[in-house]
Every structure is written in C-alpha cells, then in structure tokens.
UniProtKB/Swiss-Prot annotation:
HAMAP family in alphabetical order: Kintoun
Annotated organism of origin: Oryzias latipes
GO biological process: axonemal dynein complex assembly; cilium-dependent cell motility; epithelial cilium movement involved in extracellular fluid movement
Protein name: Protein kintoun
Keywords assigned by UniProt, alphabetized: Cytoplasm
Length: 588
C-alpha cells in the first residue's frame, strides 16, 4: 500500500455478525484486554522491536525506531476540504542543521539545510464526529532550539515542513491560514522506523518495493540567499475556498396543464451556494456581501476570499445564510427574481390577455382586418364600407353582450328589488305623460275662447247624456260624445235625480271643440316617446265613472228674473242658459 493512502475496511455482513457475537462473550473480552496490556508493556515493546530488527537485517536493511518528542502543533486545511494538523517533533536520530555562507557581487548570506523526517498521514476522528488528517514532521533538537529563539527561523521550519508534506504525499495545504495551536501535539504519539540498506550485504529475501528512508529537503536557493529575505515573512494572498453552486426549482402540476399559461419556466426559483471553510470555527469576523448578481465572502483570520458572479439576478433582501459548525460549511440560499413582465403594446397598454376591454379591442381590430383582407380585391371605397360595417357589427355584438350581462345581473338580484325597480319606472313614466298632457292643456288655454250664447236642441242633445228606461225600470246613462282628455265634463240632469255639470270657465268649450285637433297633435308626441325609449309603456286609459250625488230638487234650478223670463241656475257653477221659449226648453 502506498504511503498516505487511506485504509479501506473490507468486511462482510457475516464477519460483522460473528464479531458482534464475540464481543458479547466474556472470554473474548478477557483475551482482548490481555492483548492490549501485552502490547502496551515496555518490555513487550522492546522485544517486538528486536524481532523486527532481525527480520529487516535478513532482507539487507538496517532499521531504527524513532520516538518523536512533541514540540509544536500547527493547524491548516488539506485540499480545502478537511482540517489538517502538523506535529513538529524532535528526534536526535535526525541529521543536524547545516549552513553555508554564500557571497554575490552585491550581497552575501547563508544557505541552510534542514534534515527532517516525515511520517505518513493518519486519520483522526474528533469528538463531534469530524474526520481530520494528522502529519508528523521530525527535526533535530538543535534545529528546534534555533527556531525557539527566533520567530523568523521558526517560519522557515514551518515552510520546510509544508513543502515536504506537499511534495511527498501529493496534497495541497493552506499556507495562508496556517496557525499555531495551544497544545504541543495533536492525537496520540506513534513511533516510526528509519530503514537504510546495508552496504555490501546480499539480502536473503527481496526487499520491499518502497523504502521508507528518511527524507531530507532543502529550501530553494532564491529564498535563502539573503537572511533578511529568507527570514522575512512575505504577505500572501487569501485562499479561495471550495464552493458548489446549485439551482433549485419547484415542480407544480399546474405547469403541465394544456394551456398557454401553463408553460414551465426554465428560470430557477433559488440559488444555493455551499462553501467549505474547514479552518473557520465560527462566523465571527467573516463578511458576506450579496448584490443583485454578485456574492463576496471575506475573512481575515483565517484568510479567505471568494467572489462569485451569479447567472441570475437575486433578491438580496430575502436571502438566507446558515453555518454548520460540525462540518464547517456555509450554505447561502438566494431567491431568484422573477422574469421581467412582457413588453407593452405600441399604444402603451399592457398585455391584452389580462384585460377584457383590451380583448374586445383586439377582437374588433382582428375582425376589421379580416373584413379588409376579404375586400382587398374590390374597389377602395368598397373596402372602406366593409371595414366600417364590420366595425359597426362588432360594436353591436359588444352592446348585446353588455345588455346580456346587465340582464344576468338583474336576474341575480332579489325579487323584491326587481319589483321595486319596475314600480319606480312605471311611476316615472306616468309623471312624464302627465307633464306632456299639462303642456298640451296649456296650449289649448291660449287659443281663442268661443262664447256660445245660443245652442240648438240638437247641439245640446249631443252634449247631454240621455236616459232611457230599461224594461226593469232602471235608468242607464249613455255617453254620446266624449273628448279624449277634457278639462271638465258637462252633464245635464234628465230627471229630478240628475243634474248638469258645467265647466268652470268658458275655455272648456274651446277645449271640446278642439279635442280632435289636440288628439291629432298629441299622437306624434306619443310615437316619438315610443321611438325614444322602447322600455317606456303608455299609461292605461281610465274612464271616470259617474258618481251618485244627491241632486237638489228641480224647483231650485228655476228662477224668474226681473223681465219675467225663466232662468235655470246651476248651484255648482256660475254658467247659465237664458231660455227664450219655455215649452221648447222644458226639461221635465
């Protein structure tokens, strides 16, 4: 197995079952505890090392067991995913540091050689369940003594350890976020082996393919030419953490309907950004800025910087960020802004599908265009007439739809409201007809008054309601002539129980004479009213029935004037008739 490669446990389900049963057995527990005591005993450890040394000599190798002494512990990250710990240890079996003076034309300095021993990384499980990697680097005690006195020399030791681990185990360590820990050693110290081939010795057994000999690494020449530059800590750029961007969408069954509006949008609902920060224990000191299409994360200790340009504009005010302390992972959720609304029409109106008025207008325009296209082969005047006729027809259809909506709304209303509205309309129509009648009566009053001094018997008979005796002896009133809308009525009693109703003014006669003319003049007015509004119904004509009134005796109607002529007076009116011939005008 290669150095630094992770161990994989291959075990079957049957083996797990057997092992679980054995652990529950008391005998197995006792044997296991005895084994731990034997391997941890110093005497048994010494015996084990001697046996391994003899075995390696048969293979032609000389080995030495290294027991590291803790000195410093460093913390960083490996490959930007896991936490990494580097234990700098002391061992007297490692080579001593060496230095050489180097002179150039302008300046001179020293070149150091720091031998060190690298131990393969091992996995360590922390209390919270997180997995970390531990590397051990051993230096000679003199090297660590110089590093303890000078911080600049200590920085050189750290750089040598990081470069050696990256070169030997093909990993990438975070130099900018390297920091010292309060403890001297991370984990449990483990011994390692230095294996060297024996010169001139033929191995009885073939050696292993890989030789775990101690490695010695030197700093580059350009970094150690001058002590001032070698020992000076140069500023480094902040590291860019590992991140992942995910686009999240929501599936809704309404998006799969057979409709124009159910088209599924390719625009995501949210953008989820996951950032790994293995060296950041808390979010204290971290700055996160989110703009419409940009995300910036900065941290000074440890030094992180991440700048992302987003593919979609996001709503920075409604974003969410969550930091997981166990995994040391920051999750940022940003809602994507909805797409812009559809562009407006040239007239400035919004999308026509959202407004019924715009739908009607679009329908009118489409029908007008169809009519214009059909009449394109005809004369230009015919096209104009067809377009106008099509527009008029569409407007009539719209009016019909509006009336239908009104009727539908009226049907949805309660019955008592509909009845009240009908009675109100009839009441208004009645008052309108009365106003028209009053105007006609005013015109009649302005006409010339006709004074009748004498009337013949035939003219009186035409105005007087006559009575005829029925076979049963009952009297019936027969109206011989009636005006359509007279101002007053004239009735002359034919017996002792009937009397004559005479108009108050002499203008009533003119009203009766001109009744037919007024009727003919009034008829066009009613027709105009019917044409103006079909909903207005003509008022019903009601004939006034004669009322039974207590009539005074006939003698009270006859009086003799100073000339000796007999005169008939009406107690209810001021009009009277002068009788020239008593026999001719006797009423009894």
């Amino acid at each position: 197995m290669e150095v630094g490669k992770k161990l994989e446990l291959s075990i079957t389900a049957d083996e797990v079952e057997v092992l679980s049963k054995a652990i529950k057995n008391e005998k197995f527990q006792e044997m296991l505890s005895n084994y731990f005591q034997e391997i941890s005993s110093p005497e048994n450890v010494k015996t084990y090392q001697e046996e391994v040394t003899l075995l390696e000599q048969k293979r032609g190798n000389s080995i030495e067991f290294i027991h590291p002494s803790p000195f410093r512990a460093l913390e960083t990250s490996v490959d930007g995913k896991q936490r990494c710990f580097i234990n700098i240890c002391a061992c007297d079996k490692v080579g001593k540091p060496e230095s050489k003076t180097v002179r150039t034309v302008q300046r001179f300095g020293e070149k150091w050689s720091l031998p060190h021993l690298l131990q393969p990384g091992r996995q360590n499980c922390e209390r919270k369940g997180n997995i970390s990697t531990i590397y051990d680097v051993c230096f000679h005690p003199e090297t660590l003594h110089l590093a303890d006195k000078s911080e600049k020399f200590m920085d050189m030791v750290k750089e040598v350890a990081i470069q050696g681990i990256q070169k030997a185990f093909k990993v990438l360590l975070d130099k900018s976020n390297l920091k010292e820990m309060d403890i001297k050693y991370k984990g449990v110290p483990q011994s390692c082996v230095i294996r060297k081939p024996i010169p001139g010795y033929e191995a009885k057994e073939p050696p292993e393919e890989r030789d775990l000999s101690p490695s010695t690494s030197h700093l580059p020449e350009n970094s150690i030419d001058v002590p001032s530059k070698l020992l000076q800590k140069q500023p480094e750029e902040p590291i860019k953490p590992i991140y992942a961007i995910k686009y999240r969408s929501v599936i809704d069954l309404q998006d799969f309907r057979v409709s124009r509006e159910s088209a599924r949008s390719l625009r995501p609902k949210e953008i989820v950004i996951t950032i790994d920060l293995p060296l950041l224990p808390t979010v204290h000191g971290m700055v996160l800025e989110v703009e419409e299409k940009r995300l910036l994360l900065e941290s000074e200790n440890p030094s992180y910087r991440l700048e992302l340009h987003l593919s979609y504009p996001v709503d920075e005010n409604n974003g969410k960020a969550k930091f997981n302390k166990h995994q040391r992972q920051l999750t940022v959720t940003l809602p994507v802004q909805p797409p812009l609304e559809a562009p407006q029409l040239p007239g400035g109106s919004p999308n026509p599908t959202s407004d019924p008025q715009n739908e009607n207008q679009t329908r009118v325009e489409e029908r007008v265009e169809e009519m214009a296209e059909k009449g394109g082969e005809q004369h230009q005047r015919g096209n104009d007439n067809g377009a106008a006729q099509g527009r008029r027809q569409v407007l009539e259809d719209q009016n019909g739809e509006k009336e239908g909506k009104k009727i539908q709304k009226r049907n949805e209303r309660p019955e008592h409201e509909v009845k009240n509205e009908t009675l109100r309309k009839k009441h208004d129509e009645k008052f309108e007809l009365q106003d028209v009648q009053q105007e006609n009566k005013g015109n009649c009053s302005n006409t010339k008054e006709v004074k009748c001094c004498r009337r013949t018997k035939d003219s009186l008979d035409s105005l007087i309601p006559t009575t005829a005796a029925s076979p049963d002896g009952q009297k019936k009133h027969i109206l011989t002539q009636e005006t359509e809308k007279p101002k007053g009525s004239v009735e002359i009693p034919t017996s002792s129980q009937e009397y004559l109703k005479v108009p108050v003014t002499s203008a009533a006669t003119a009203a009766n004479v001109n009744a037919s003319d007024e009727t003919s003049k009034r008829k066009p007015t009613e027709e105009q009213l019917e044409d103006a509004d079909e909903d207005v119904l003509p008022a019903e004509q009601r004939f006034q029935e004669p009322e039974e009134i207590n009539v005074p005796a006939a003698g009270t109607l006859r009086q003799n004037n100073a000339a000796g002529n007999e005169k008939i007076n009406d107690p209810h009116t001021s009009a009277g008739f002068v009788l020239q011939n008593k026999l001719m005008y006797e009423l009894d």
